Amino acid sequence: YTVLVQEIIDQLAETKYPTHVFVPGGVGGLAAAVAAHFHESLGKKRPKIIVVEPNSAACIFKSVQRDRIMKAEGNLDTFMACLSAGEVSPIAWPIIRSSVDHVIAIPDAAAIDAMKILAMPPFNDQSVNAGESGVAAIAGIISCDQKND
């Protein structure tokens, strides 16, 4: 995962680093790797890291709220199947705890809407065929925009 982040850093001029990065949650491995690499590479210039996960499997959200690893309770079924994690990875947790700025939980409908937008984009943009879990970050961005957060 860190190669992905390094490619982003290498391709962007220092004045064009992202201010915010939205990352799918799951058990937290991707989120931890992204957060850690931006932190190590950019220090205080690093972007805000926002983790996005499904409402029904919001283990990172609950863990951050309680400041300890928490299991997601109840039915973990979600349209975003690859993010249906019941518990944060104990390896990822210390990094998430110290380097993630925000965590948001979204409904399945947000992922469905994001898939539709990417498949049939406005303004004649190129379409993107993305899966249910892959659109979580985009759905998180749209969700924040709709709430004016």
Across the structure, where does each feature detected by a protein language model lie?
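PLP-dependent amino-acid enzyme catalytic core
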Residues: Y1-D149
